[in-house]
């Protein structure tokens, strides 16, 4: 048997992506000023970042990062279990636990790593099972596959589907995992109903609230708190420090026993250098500002409502979302890419989301809003969206003879 050549495989896959127009290109940001970005010498208003509360360039957070870097250096120098766990890490974990109402928190470099850690450490047997929403983030899906346990997926937001999957797999330990806010659709999981299913089926309920933290709930405490669920009902959740909080990193929240088990057994935690202390200091300050500045969430919600109202008035096919993630359904990839390019010509950066990130035929423009956007920017964007849609429809219309 001839062993496959990896270089040939790579070239073949690249040709396939080219034929399908599914190559990916990184855009270099030369400068940033709030929601304005400079790319190739041109300034664009971006509607595609996750800086929901507008904290990424907040002067207090920058000052906290600079002070910590001057004091502790630019890196942790080791994993948490060796000599990388600094006082600022401890303070950040305490603040997170107090804010979200959990006994303990555990810091990670990013949400993807944290999701890998959870399932690798908890679902250790082949007959264990993780039941997930079909539209969960890729890191949750990949985590189950890498853990080596069984993966079962239920239709999006389908509580009965989740219950059915758990009932059909009574053997082995079980986890029911869901996003809080879904990153590509912007809708919110039915957490209260899912938590009841998890308790009934003796499954551990795990919520990845990467896009909910800071945005919803009391003091921005996220989707779990917004649903008035207790630690007993959602024993484990993940939050990121890189979206509404504007920085970098992630944390797991759970009981003291659960968090200690993860710290002692989760390989992605044990064998990874700790989050830089300066980033931890920035996140700590960001949390305090997010908790304090209720006006940011109020402003953000006003902009969401304005965008949706204007979009409906212009007949735009927006999806059902009340969060800062506002997808515009375009259907085919060609139309989506053309609309994204047309918006850029008008001074807006809105990314086209295509398969495999979303299902075939579900390509979309993923508009994300920030508390820093102005009402004028919202209104002008909607007008540009309507113009680009109409222009493409005119081009596609058959010529009358």
Swiss-Prot record:
Its cofactor is pyridoxal 5'-phosphate. Substrate binds at residues 24, 137, 357. Keywords: Biotin biosynthesis, Pyridoxal phosphate, Transferase. Its EC number is 2.3.1.47. GO terms for biological process: biotin biosynthetic process. It catalyses: 6-carboxyhexanoyl-[ACP] + L-alanine + H(+) = (8S)-8-amino-7-oxononanoate + holo-[ACP] + CO2. Pfam families: Aminotran_1_2 (PF00155). The modification N6-(pyridoxal phosphate)lysine is found at residue 243. The keyword Lipid metabolism does not apply. It is an enzyme of class 2 (transferase). Pathway: Cofactor biosynthesis; biotin biosynthesis. The keyword Protein transport does not apply. Pyridoxal 5'-phosphate binds at residues 111-112, 183, 211, 240. One of its GO terms (molecular function) is pyridoxal phosphate binding. Belongs to the class-II pyridoxal-phosphate-dependent aminotransferase family. BioF subfamily. Homodimer. Catalyzes the decarboxylative condensation of pimeloyl-[acyl-carrier protein] and L-alanine to produce 8-amino-7-oxononanoate (AON), [acyl-carrier protein], and carbon dioxide. PANTHER family: 8-AMINO-7-OXONONANOATE SYNTHASE, CLASS II AMINOTRANSFERASE/8-AMINO-7-OXONONANOATE SYNTHASE. This is 8-amino-7-oxononanoate synthase. It comes from Xylella fastidiosa (strain 9a5c).
């Amino acid at each position: 048997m001839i062993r496959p050549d990896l270089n040939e495989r790579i070239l073949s896959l690249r040709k396939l992506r080219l034929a399908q127009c599914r190559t990916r290109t990184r855009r270099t940001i030369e400068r940033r000023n709030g929601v304005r970005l400079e790319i190739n010498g041109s300034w664009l208003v971006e509607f595609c970042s996750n800086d929901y509360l507008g904290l990424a360039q907040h002067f207090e957070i920058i000052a906290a990062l600079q002070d910590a870097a001057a004091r502790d250096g630019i890196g942790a120098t080791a994993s948490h279990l060796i000599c990388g766990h600094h006082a600022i890490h401890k303070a950040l974990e305490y603040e997170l636990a107090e804010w979200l109402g959990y006994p303990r928190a555990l810091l990670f470099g990013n949400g993807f790593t944290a999701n890998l850690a959870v399932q690798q450490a908890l679902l250790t047997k082949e007959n264990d099972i993780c039941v997930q929403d079909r539209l969960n983030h890729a890191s949750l899906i990949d985590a189950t596959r890498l853990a080596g346990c069984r993966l079962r997926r239920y239709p999006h937001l389908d509580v009965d589907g989740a219950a059915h999957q758990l009932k059909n797999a009574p053997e082995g330990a079980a986890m029911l995992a869901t996003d809080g806010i879904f990153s590509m659709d912007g809708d919110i999981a039915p957490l209260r109903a899912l938590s009841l299913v998890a308790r009934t089926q003796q499954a551990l309920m795990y919520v990845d609230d990467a896009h909910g933290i800071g945005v919803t709930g009391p003091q921005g405490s996220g989707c779990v708190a917004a649903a008035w669920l207790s630690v007993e009902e959602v024993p484990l959740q993940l939050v990121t420090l890189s979206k509404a909080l504007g920085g970098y990193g992630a944390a797991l929240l759970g009981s003291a026993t659960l968090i200690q088990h993860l710290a002692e057994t989760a390989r992605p935690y044990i064998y990874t250098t700790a989050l830089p202390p300066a980033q931890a200091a920035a996140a700590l300050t960001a949390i305090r500002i997010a908790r304090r500045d209720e006006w940011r969430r109020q402003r953000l919600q006003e902009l969401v409502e304005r965008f949706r109202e204007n979009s409906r008035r212009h007949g735009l096919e927006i999806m059902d979302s009340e969060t800062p993630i506002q997808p515009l359904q375009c259907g085919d990839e060609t139309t989506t890419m053309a609309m994204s390019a047309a918006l850029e010509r008008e001074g807006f950066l809105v990314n086209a989301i295509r398969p495999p990130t979303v299902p075939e035929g579900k390509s979309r423009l993923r508009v994300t809003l920030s508390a820093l956007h102005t009402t004028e920017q919202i209104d002008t964007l909607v007008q540009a969206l309507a113009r680009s849609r109409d222009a493409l429809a005119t081009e596609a219309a058959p010529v009358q003879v």
